[in-house]
């Protein structure tokens, strides 16, 4: 959880700003995103006439798995944040504001806190490539034995055949006889 209390900023005039520094910040962003180290970034929180506008960039080293060789690797990812959070309570009266349940607007909770973890999770998840590679020229795995091809010389006997295809090879041999 990366929660920041913005009660003071909500009581200031529009245009007031605060800076949030995420230096050496570790956070759990869910089972599908694993940080390999601390996040680093700067978020600028600005009071608007409706809520708090958050802008900035965050860098996070993410653990990924190569789609070719299945080896883990670390990729440094930088995301830009540009979102407005609206209060769920009126800043002056502390009375609940009317919120449409279908509204997808990011909200400041009843304790005047913004939890950035869900937003960072979503932004960092969008950086996941369709086909993650540890390096562009990754040779992958041997189709016969499954060993990593990057480990060096890899040989098999020429007559080795994938067991599911063995019956087809026998039929082909009979046809050629």
Q: Predicted segment positions?
A:
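Structured interface patches
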Residues: 1-177
């Amino acid at each position: 959880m990366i929660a920041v209390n913005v009660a003071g900023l909500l009581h200031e005039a529009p245009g007031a700003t605060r800076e949030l520094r995420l230096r050496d910040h570790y956070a759990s962003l869910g089972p599908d995103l694993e940080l390999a180290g601390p996040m680093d970034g700067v978020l600028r929180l600005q009071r608007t006439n409706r809520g708090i506008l958050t802008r900035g960039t965050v860098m996070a080293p993410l653990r990924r798995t190569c789609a070719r060789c299945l080896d883990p690797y670390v990729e440094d990812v930088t995301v830009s944040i540009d979102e407005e959070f609206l209060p769920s309570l009126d800043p002056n009266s502390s009375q609940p504001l009317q919120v449409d349940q279908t509204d997808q607007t990011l909200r400041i909770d009843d304790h005047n806190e913004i939890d950035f973890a869900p937003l960072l999770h979503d932004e960092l998840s969008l950086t996941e490539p369709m086909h993650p590679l540890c390096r562009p020229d990754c040779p992958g795995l041997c189709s016969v034995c499954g060993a990593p091809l990057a480990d060096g010389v890899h040989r098999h006997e020429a007559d080795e055949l994938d067991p599911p295809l063995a019956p087809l090879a026998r039929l082909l041999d009979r046809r050629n006889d």
